[in-house]
UniProtKB/Swiss-Prot annotation:
Pathway: Cell wall biogenesis; peptidoglycan biosynthesis. This is UDP-N-acetylglucosamine 1-carboxyvinyltransferase. The lineage of its organism: Bacteria, Pseudomonadati, Pseudomonadota, Gammaproteobacteria, Enterobacterales. Cell wall formation. Adds enolpyruvyl to UDP-N-acetylglucosamine. Target for the antibiotic fosfomycin. The gene is murA. Its EC number is 2.5.1.7. Competitively inhibited by UDP-N-acetylglucosamine 3'-phosphate, with a Ki of 7 uM. In vitro inhibited by covalent binding of fosfomycin and the fungal product terreic acid in the presence of substrate UDP-N-acetylglucosamine, with an inactivation rate constant of 102 M(-1)sec(-1) for terreic acid. Pfam families: EPSP_synthase.
Amino acid sequence: MDKFRVQGPTKLQGEVTISGAKNAALPILFAALLAEEPVEIQNVPKLKDVDTSMKLLSQLGAKVERNGSVHIDARDVNVFCAPYDLVKTMRASIWALGPLVARFGQGQVSLPGGCTIGARPVDLHISGLEQLGATIKLEEGYVKASVDGRLKGAHIVMDKVSVGATVTIMCAATLAEGTTIIENAAREPEIVDTANFLITLGAKISGQGTDRIVIEGVERLGGGVYRVLPDRIETGTFLVAAAISRGKIICRNAQPDTLDAVLAKLRDAGADIEVGEDWISLDMHGKRPKAVNVRTAPHPAFPTDMQAQFTLLNLVAEGTGFITETVFENRFMHVPELSRMGAHAEIESNTVICHGVEKLSGAQVMATDLRASASLVLAGCIAEGTTVVDRIYHIDRGYERIEDKLRALGANIERVKGE
């Protein structure tokens, strides 16, 4: 397995170009299964999960090509099963189910894999599809969905806010007969992006970005060209990198209005932040950040995917800060690893109490999930001495060329190929 070797401390400064959002690209790739004409998707990040999704679409019979943009022609899809060998590494595969059953009347997906953070069950996806008229069976490790004729529009009240299930229901409802209303829908920018992609293909959707999405079913979806929005979590990660190293950064190809909660906390930490239409700059003026209190919650509140990075910020900040995680259980696996580097933290149920220290020291640490591993790499950039981050395949699932981008900001980082 590959590792990163990071030599610190360095001040990170310069410019970084933000990639397309993984969490929008993946649902959009699967939503392309609904289209009866070719689609072109631009600004798709080069990531392991994206490659796996493209491979899966090919196995279903779609023609998939990448030359800058990703081109998908799903006219000849003739396989309706997403097999275990592809699904086991990536939970996003469940998003194939809604489009398959909506367009072809049948679909089956092996139960998914992915990061190990907490319970992320597929029950909300299943109950949503059942309410649209699909028959669901769980057999031999597969979720099997079928319907005679078309799905039927329904009024669906989500038990809890779920980005994944909102995507599944919204995609399936585009080809259902009649109107579907999703109440307590997720409001994330990536949901809005997926909806806008579907609208480009001819879907009738309104209310995306609010907690009530209305979908009027249409008979078919055509083709089109669509550009994936910038990755707000990658943007936030690089802003934190500059903040903890007392540096200065400009993030290009960003979308500031998707990051309001994160930018507010960075300002509280003492960062000087400016935004333009598609850029964000942060300048610490050489100062150490101040500790901040953070509580994660569904959008538009503070995103859980930025929690590990802000835990790190607090651990090197002036003062004591509290980080409370309300979205996923079991999402503090980075804290013991940061403690190995000299961080002072206590975990009390779903809160980390962070006591800022002047400096961290390099150590051998292990990545446990995608965002936690990014925080360990950033910690290595500012720690004194050498840090080796093991199991970085987690990072490759969500960050495009993170070592190249950090190196361009002045980091001393190299990838060590595993045996």
